[in-house]
Amino acid sequence: RRQLPDDAPTAPPAAGLPWTARLAALWSPAHARATLMLWLLWFTVVFSYYGMFLWLPSVMVGKGFALIKSFEYVLLMTLAQLPGYFTAAWLIERAGRKFVLVVYLTGTAASAWAFGNADTQGALLLYGALLSFFNLGAWGALYAYSPENYPAPIRASGVGTAAGIGRLGGILGPLAIPFLGAQGWSTGAIFGLFAATLMVGVLAVALLGRETRGEQAVG
């Protein structure tokens, strides 16, 4: 049929490109900045999430709480994840993707440091809940933001490789706590490392990321 002026342009299918071409496209001058930013972002978010949350019960036991009580406290902390996710989802269309990611990642980093250095039940519950709130909010913004950085022919490859880098972080994060603990690191120092890692993600978004709110997806 005749193509009308308002017809969306047809993009070449991603499946028609070999994977080597799609990978090369991710590091082309047009997309290298976004790729570096997303790889850093996914690594820091997944590294910190699995590193911290899989070990929360053990951390609580190490701070002097009984094992059963530790699981109860962790359950209470994780309930804060839902409002964190929903508030981030609400804010990304109003304040922008970069703003939400920077704020929620910074909140996660600050909460991680505070949790690692807390020594009372009230402080642990408060900072643990804030940690859950901000971390899952950052996850929500990350899922919305990542595909908006690439055109359709390489979008799946771009997000998939970034998520793959995140998976690497998800493997290394849980291994970090027992390894560093065996080297004599305190809980505060270990969670300080997670906080510093998260701030790398903050800098990546702030310095390398672009705001995609309101942009029309490139077909």
What are the roles of these predicted feature ranges?
Residues 195-219:
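Multi-pass alpha-helical transporter architecture, strongest
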Residues 94-105:
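Cytoplasmic membrane-interface "Motif A"-like loop-to-helix N-cap segments
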Residues 27-86:
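Extracytoplasmic gate region of multi-pass secondary transporters
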Residues 60-61, 91-92, 177-185:
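Interfacial helix-cap and linker-helix signal at transmembrane-aqueous boundaries
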Residues 181-196:
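A membrane-interface helix-boundary motif in multi-pass transporters
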Residues 106-119:
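C-terminal ends and interior cores of transmembrane alpha-helices
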Residues 1-34, 62, 215-219:
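Intracellular cytosolic loops and amphipathic helices of Major Facilitator Superfamily
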Residues 86-96:
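Helix-to-loop junctions at the C-terminal end of transmembrane segments
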